[in-house]
Amino acid sequence: MSHEEDLIDYSDEELQTTDAAATTAAPASNGEAKKGDLTVSGGRPDKKGSYVGIHSTGFRDFLLKEELLRAITDCGFEHPSEVQQVCIPTAILNVDVLCQAKSGLGKTAVFVLTTLHQLEPVPGECSILVMCHTRELAYQIKNEYARFSKYLPDVKTAVFYGGTPIQKDVELLSNKESYPNIVVGTPGRLNALVRDKKLSLRNVKAFVLDECDKMLDQIDMRRDVQEIFRATPADKQVMMFSATLSQEIRPVCKKFMRNPLEVYVDDDTKLTLHGLQQYYIKLSEAEKNRKLNELLDSLEFNQVIIFVKSTLRANELDKLLRECNFPSIAVHSGVSQEERIKRYKEFKEFNKRICVATDVFGRGIDIERINLAINYDLPADADSYLHRVGRAGRFGTKGLSISFVSTEDDEKVLKDIEKRFEVALPEYPEGGVDSSTYMA
């Protein structure tokens, strides 16, 4: 499978595993409903029920297991988000789901709660498989499963990703007592475990891709995903989620599914983040450090994430900040896996307030206290910008993002962002910003 076309298109025989219901499935536009900026379609095969008529004001309305409701209460969640209201009632009926919703709207909880509700754990069997594209995100998802399964003592969850000795994974999987019912991981490591027959997927009931566009866009990662997919049963439930799902990638996602419920929260061109104030500052490369120091001195914030374009710049900026007595840490692919997780936990647990990161932290990472995101280096495209600034203002809370614009390329990206999301980003005011407008 060396050509891209081979990775996108299955043969007729392979399609039988995902399109068994093609003759009876409705076209994607069938039953489309639109309310405000929410578009819902499909996902209503006979005898499977649907979300129609269900508008929940509380998680109890979803009729979830009592143990899950207790865990939800412990987490302090009262009302489901819009995406949770639409997806969960249908997803728990075993319907496939393709969902695009902005950062911070609770997509992770959709598949975590759905799969835990459906799960009947069998010792020594993996029933739920969740894949994502970075180790940090895998680690975070595993923690979400731990959080919501606290009253389900028989449920075992494990996370597998590269950068750590595979022998530890093999040992865990060779012991029936520790064998996980829920597996979370990155495609490369999971594929190695499946190929070596250390991880059996023959009992998988739910197959989940988080940040699915990132995995299916990259040829090598897509190849791993497809190989793993073929090792699972044909009649499983498939769910895919991302903050950005282009028109081009949606058909690729749907090749893995049968008549999915399609949920697109906000039109693709209007993926702005409510509650997040966004500004830019024009300056030269040489002025960046001084301006960053000024901002960190003058702005109020709980936690800040500062994005740079390379591991070298992350290390240099982190060192500079610490020399200026700013308590920062750096997270990027050049740091060992063990150290990355340690630093992630330090930041997550509020032991550090400033994090300098590359795009390894740009997607999916959910740290609720971040309310300031600074693009020290502007990203290469509009989608990456959305994912980065989405780290501030999670779940509809207030936040502030500031982007440094210093080159012609930066100006082009800024124009692309404004065009793509139909917004006009204002220049950062000389007098600064009133903290009450972005501090929750």
UniProtKB/Swiss-Prot annotation:
Protein name: ATP-dependent RNA helicase sub2
All copies of domain Helicase ATP-binding, residue ranges: 88-263
Signal peptide (UniProt feature, chain positions): none
Segments forming domain Helicase C-terminal: 291-436
InterPro entries in UniProt: DEAD/DEAH_box_helicase_dom (IPR011545), Helicase_ATP-bd (IPR014001), Helicase_C-like (IPR001650), P-loop_NTPase (IPR027417), RNA_helicase_DEAD_Q_motif (IPR014014)
GO CC annotation terms, alphabetical: chromosome, telomeric region; spliceosomal complex; transcription export complex
Keywords: ATP-binding, Helicase, Hydrolase, mRNA processing, mRNA splicing, mRNA transport, Nucleotide-binding, Nucleus, RNA-binding, Spliceosome, Transport
Residues that hold ATP according to the record: 101-108
Disulfide bonds: none
Motif Q motif positions after renumbering to this chain: 57-85
Protein's job: ATP-binding RNA helicase involved in transcription elongation and required for the export of mRNA out of the nucleus. SUB2 also plays a role in pre-mRNA splicing and spliceosome assembly. May be involved in rDNA and telomeric silencing, and maintenance of genome integrity.
SUPFAM superfamilies, alphabetized: P-loop containing nucleoside triphosphate hydrolases (SSF52540)
Gene Ontology molecular functions: ATP binding; ATP hydrolysis activity; RNA binding; RNA helicase activity
Enzyme Commission number(s): 3.6.4.13
Organism per entry: Aspergillus niger (strain ATCC MYA-4892 / CBS 513.88 / FGSC A1513)
Localization (cell): Nucleus
Region (Disordered) residue spans: 1-42
Gene encoding the protein: sub2
Family to which the UniProt record says this protein belongs: Belongs to the DEAD box helicase family. DECD subfamily.
Classification lineage: Eukaryota, Fungi, Dikarya, Ascomycota, Pezizomycotina
Biased composition (Acidic residues): 1-16
